[in-house]
Amino acid sequence: MLVLGIESTAHTFSIGIVKDGKILSQLGKTYIPPSGAGIHPREAAEHHARHAPAILRQLLDMLGLALSDVDVVAYAAGPGLGPALRIGAVLARALAIKLGIPLVPVHHGVAHIEVARYTTNACDPLVVLVSGGHTVITGYSDGRYRVFGETLDVAIGNAIDVFAREVGLGFPGVPAVEKCAEAADTVVAFPMPIIGQDLSYAGLVTHALQLVKSGTPLPVVCKSLIETAYYMLAEVVERALAYTKKKEVVVAGGVARSKRLREILSAASGEHDAVVKIVPDEYAGDNGAMIALTGYYAYKHGIYTTPEQSFVKQRWRLDNVDVPWFYDLCNPH
C-alpha cells in the first residue's frame, strides 16, 4: 500500500511517500519570511500553492512512481495556520477525487510523535514534543496521547523565534540564538514560570528583551534564555517520569535538533533511569513523510474520510485524537 502525505500547517510545504509502513522519501520547500517579520499566513499559503505541483512531480519522478500508483492520500488537517492548511487539504481532496482513493486527515502533532517513534524504535515513551507550534509533554494511555504538561501561552520554538526576530538574529530563531549564546560564559537570572505541570514562555521573551534594552550583552541574554527555557522543560519531564515510571523519553519536533536541549533532557532523564531517543534531524521539522506514515497507520485501522466530509482545524488538541495503532509500533520494523 502506497500512501502519499501532504504537510502544509505553517511555513513548510512537503510531500512524503510511505510504502507498507516504510518511509520511501520526502520533498519540501520552506517559506522564509522577510527579514524582521514573522510568518504571514496568506503569504505562506501562496508559497505553498506556487510550489506544490513541482514538488509532487519531482518526488514521484525521483521514486520512479506514477500518480496512479498512490493508494491513499493523507494530509495534515491541523492544528496550524488556516490559509496554509487549506492549500494542503485542497490538493489532497483533488488527488482523492482524481484517483478515486481514500482520504485520511492527520493531526500534525501526532504525526511528529509517530515519526519519532518509528525512527527511534520507541514503544511506550514519554514524549517531549517541541516545535514552533507545540510544547507538550505527553504519553499514551487508554487510546490517546494524554498531556502531562504543556505551554499555557506560546510554544518554545515560537518564543525563541520571536526573540531572535526582535534582536535581529534572523529566522529560524532557535539555531541563531544558540549560536549567539556560544559567545557567553555566564548567565543572568530569569524567572522560571512553571505552574503545576505547565509552562509559560511568553514572559521569558519579554524579560529577555528588557535585558537587551537595558544593556545586558546579547550573548549573555541568549544563553540565559536558552538555558532557562530548556531547564523548565526538564523540570516537567522529571515530574512526568516520576509519575509514569516510563523508561524511554522521545524528543520530537523541530526544536529536537538542539544539541543543548538533548544534553539537558538526557541528564534529567538519567536521574530516572530513562533513555532519551531523539528524532533524526531530517524528520524533526515539519515534513510530508510523517503525515504519510501516520496516515498509513490510521487507514489500517479504518480511519479515513471522503472529500465532502474532510476538514481542517486551526485548533485541535493532541488529546482529542484516537490512536488505535499505538502498539503496532512496538514490534521492530
From Swiss-Prot:
Biological source species: Pyrobaculum islandicum (strain DSM 4184 / JCM 9189 / GEO3)
Cellular location(s): Cytoplasm
Cellular component aspect of the GO annotation: cytoplasm; EKC/KEOPS complex
GO BP: tRNA threonylcarbamoyladenosine modification
Protein name: tRNA N6-adenosine threonylcarbamoyltransferase
Protein's job: Required for the formation of a threonylcarbamoyl group on adenosine at position 37 (t(6)A37) in tRNAs that read codons beginning with adenine. Is probably involved in the transfer of the threonylcarbamoyl moiety of threonylcarbamoyl-AMP (TC-AMP) to the N6 group of A37.
Primary location class: cytoplasm
Recorded name of the encoding gene: kae1
Cofactor(s) the protein requires to work: Fe(2+)
EC code: 2.3.1.234
Entry keyword annotation includes Glycoprotein: no
Xref: Pfam families: TsaD
Cofactor note text: Binds 1 Fe(2+) ion per subunit.
Catalyses which reaction(s): L-threonylcarbamoyladenylate + adenosine(37) in tRNA = N(6)-L-threonylcarbamoyladenosine(37) in tRNA + AMP + H(+)
Family: Belongs to the KAE1 / TsaD family.
GO molecular function, one term: N(6)-L-threonylcarbamoyladenine synthase activity
Keyword terms, alphabetized: Acyltransferase, Cytoplasm, Iron, Metal-binding, Transferase, tRNA processing
Binding site for Fe cation: 108, 112, 286
Binding site for substrate: 129-133, 161, 178, 258
